[in-house]
Design a protein with these regions (language model features):
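A short glycine-rich, hydrophobically flanked beta-strand micro-motif that places a catalytic Asp/Glu
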Residues: 249-261
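C-terminal active-site "lid" helix and adjoining low-complexity regulatory extension at the edge
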Residues: 258-311
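ATP-grasp fold ATP-binding core
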Residues: 111-112, 138-157, 178-193
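Phosphate-binding site of ATP-dependent enzymes
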Residues: 160-247
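Extreme N-terminal starter segment of soluble prokaryotic enzymes
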Residues: 1-13
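Short acidic/polar capping segments at secondary-structure boundaries
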Residues: 97-98, 125-129, 151-155, 165-167, ...
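Protein kinase-like catalytic core scaffold
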Residues: 146, 209-210, 252, 265-268
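Conserved N-proximal alpha/beta basic substrate-recognition cap immediately N-terminal to
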Residues: 16-130
Length: 311
């Protein structure tokens, strides 16, 4: 891809500006520290960047995808990520790998087969939504209320957390049209240190970080080594590593709850294009700054490692 290309970037990053500049600045900083050039593909530039990329005028050795719509193949960011993968750019994460992992209906049976604890689930295809009826067996399996999620949904859009009947499927489908919907038993986390035992675990090219994530208030706090030991939270790492091995994903987070019975249940399987809003910018829903910085560093290191191997 290098012959005839006017401009080559070591690392490009797609971004929809749905976070603050802290993560972007840390990526830029770490690139500068290890002598990688960098380009931020913002909405204002994406059409032109795509055109130049398509015509072979620019190329990126690595592309960090922080924004593309899996459910909208016509989306310009989606098309750019696919084009980059076709042009042998190292994409974090490759679009086919990311889509397969992000598709909850597709991943759910694989997790079950791998003996990873997930909520009891019924999968309903879009074509069945209008005429679907819960059997008595279904009602026992799901309990009441139960949760409904679109297979390719994110950001809670289309999620119904207080479903009581099949009629609630229409609410989810109206909010987020999708090919499939998951009806799931609602998992209630136990309480530890006056907070829900609910965690967001980040996997970034073999490195793992753990956050307490309050599923009722959205607040994050990094788990300490002492807490990991005191509360027996070591299974969190094993679970996220198994999910990484199963999916082939290199950068994602998983939401995991611990129940009163002590079981660790994976609630939200794979979140790619992780939310990197910093806590200093938004204390209510932001990720701790030191964690955002550490993830940015590991991503840049991984890009450099791949570039070195490719040369």
């Amino acid at each position: 891809m290098i012959r005839g290309v006017v401009r080559i970037y070591d690392l490009a990053m797609t971004h929809q500006l749905d976070a603050d500049d802290f993560f972007i600045h840390r990526v830029q900083q770490h690139c500068a520290e290890i002598h990688l050039n960098f380009f931020l593909v913002e909405p204002v530039w994406v059409e032109r960047f795509y055109d130049k990329f398509e015509r072979g005028k620019v190329w990126a050795r690595a592309l960090l995808n922080m924004h593309s719509e899996h459910h909208q193949p016509e989306d310009i960011f989606h098309r750019l990520v696919r084009l980059a993968a076709q042009r042998k750019t190292f994409v974090i994460d490759p679009p086919d790998v990311a889509l397969a992992a992000f598709n909850k209906a597709r991943l759910h049976p694989l997790l079950v087969a791998a003996d990873i604890q997930v909520p009891a689930t019924i999968i309903v295809a879009r074509e069945q939504v209008g005429g679907f009826a819960l059997s008595e067996e279904h009602r026992v399996l799901l309990g009441s209320p139960f949760v409904i999620k679109p297979s390719l949904g994110y950001g809670r859009r289309g999620v119904v957390v207080d479903a009581t009947s099949e009629r609630d499927l229409a609410r989810s489908a109206a909010a987020w049209p999708d090919a499939e919907y998951l009806l799931q038993r609602r998992i209630v986390p136990r309480t530890l240190q006056h907070s829900p035992a609910y965690f967001r675990v980040y996997f970034v090219f073999g490195a793992v970080w753990f956050c307490w994530w309050n599923c009722y208030t959205d607040r994050y706090r990094q788990a300490t080594a002492a807490e990991m030991a005191e509360f027996g939270l070591q299974p969190l790492e094993e679970l996220v590593r198994r999910i990484a091995a199963l999916t082939g994903m290199n950068f994602f987070s998983s939401e995991i709850a611990q129940t009163e019975a002590g079981e660790f249940v994976v609630i939200d399987y794979v979140n790619d294009q992780c939310h990197m809003l910093s806590q200093s910018a938004n204390p209510q829903i932001g990720v701790p700054d030191e964690l955002v910085a550490a993830i940015a560093r590991r991503l840049v290191e991984a890009a450099k490692e791949n570039i070195a191997q490719a040369r």
